[in-house]
Amino acid sequence: MKILFVEPAIFLSAFAMTLTSPLTTQYVYRRIWEETGNYTFSSDSNISECEKNKSSPIFAFQEEVQKKVSRFNLQMDISGLIPGLVSTFILLSISDHYGRKFPMILSSVGALATSVWLCLLCYFAFPFQLLIASTFIGAFCGNYTTFWGACFAYIVDQCKEHKQKTIRIAVIDFLLGLVTGLTGLSSGYFIRELGFGWSFLIIAASLAVNLIYILFFLGDPVKECSSQNVTMSCSEGFKNLFYRTYMLFKNASGKRRFLLCLLLFTTITYFFVVIGIAPIFILYELDSPLCWNEVFIGYGSALGSASFLTSFLGIWLFSYCMEDIHMAFIGIFTTMTGMVMTAFASTTLMMFLARVPFLFTIVPFSVLRSMLSKVVRSTEQGILFACIAFLETLGGVTAVSTFNGIYSATVAWYPGFTFLLSAGLLLLPAISLCVVKCTSWNEGSYELLIQEESSEDASDRAC
């Protein structure tokens, strides 16, 4: 008997993703540090390998390492851009016919292959530049954006009421926060106690268990309910894919189409800033004047991941007294405040306090996805989440590349500039949401609008 709960797969995937990101960044940082100069890291040291005295030659050396790591991250992200875009869009779009499990399985295979390669890279001390090739190959199988998009579509398929969608998506974000918080908190101890090799092996093992669960235990309601036998050539499949995307916007009324585009713009611009700035936090914390070690970086990651929990609680409480759009405003403006505080953080206490305004950072992600799902038909959910995942993949890679490039160019004269820039960019989704509000956003009215359009389409077909 198949299980219709995707939460265990999300749990394992979130653990692997959260542990992979800081481990890979710090592994590359140490490799570049050791290969650039004659300085080595002391694995049992309680302080970071960081020099605060600007007149010291080590200070100039660590600034050079920061630039090299930022540029390497840029190269690695760009290498997976094109294959990631193509695979994400195709896999999630065809999930409406072939089931949500297919993109989950393929993206899990790619993640497992990448983690195994990280183990080999670390154990045999291969050139770390080979990470670029593994990123490029792994992106063909889809990435974590593909996996999350399939999971959210899987959940929406099971939700009948609109409020249930918001709460269920918030529950998933809460689960993500719980896992990422605990994993982030322990990531520094993984490095210190087990080293990089064993840590990467644990990641590979968790992804293998995740793949087994999806293959043999997870059911697929879309595939089970689908009775049509799709037999078409590859070219016809691509044509049908893009045709369905085109019809998603064409079949909508003018007001609904405008709202759909505006909400997509809001979602992607907010995603662009939050995802783009995320890797900079670790580099910022490793550099002077903070000079954090791997344990403090783990504490910072855990505190940042607490926003998943607080965002879930916020959505759960706010949903009884305010609309979705007001919750999104709260998340955007508190995140903006956190960016400004981070830009001026010069001590450990200030950096921890700067994390406090990020408590509702995840709220706009959950709320905007829910708002988008409410303005499309139930038969268009798969293609909608394919569009979202495609834009998130494009925006995510572009954002990380852009912010890494900006940080590399500005770290020497003002490391906090990138955070001030991100705070300014958050005005874009805020303004976009104001326009949505001015169109008299009302959840119930758009539900009725969709029903009216569906009945009109049915009558047209009957004629």
UniProtKB/Swiss-Prot annotation:
Mind telling me what this protein is named?
A: Lysosomal proton-coupled steroid conjugate and bile acid symporter SLC46A3
A GO CC term?
Answer: lysosomal membrane
Q: Which family does it belong to?
A: Belongs to the major facilitator superfamily. SLC46A family.
Q: Which UniProt keywords apply?
A: Glycoprotein, Lysosome, Membrane, Signal, Symport, Transmembrane, Transmembrane helix, Transport
Q: What reaction is this protein's catalytic activity?
A: estrone 3-sulfate(out) + n H(+)(out) = estrone 3-sulfate(in) + n H(+)(in); 25-hydroxyvitamin D3 sulfate(out) + n H(+)(out) = 25-hydroxyvitamin D3 sulfate(in) + n H(+)(in); cholate(out) + n H(+)(out) = cholate(in) + n H(+)(in); glycocholate(out) + n H(+)(out) = glycocholate(in) + n H(+)(in)
Q: Which residues lie on this side of the membrane: Extracellular?
A: 21-73, 125-133, 192-197, 283-294, 346-347, 404-415
> What does this protein's UniProt record list under function?
Lysosomal proton-coupled steroid conjugate and bile acid transporter. Preferentially recognizes lipophilic steroid conjugates or bile acis as endogenous substrates and seems to mediate escape from lysosomes to the cytoplasm. Modulates hepatic cytosolic copper homeostasis, maybe acting as a lysosomal copper transporter and sequestering copper ions in the lysosome. Delivers pathogen-associated molecular patterns to cytosolic pattern recognition receptors as part of the innate immune response to microbes.
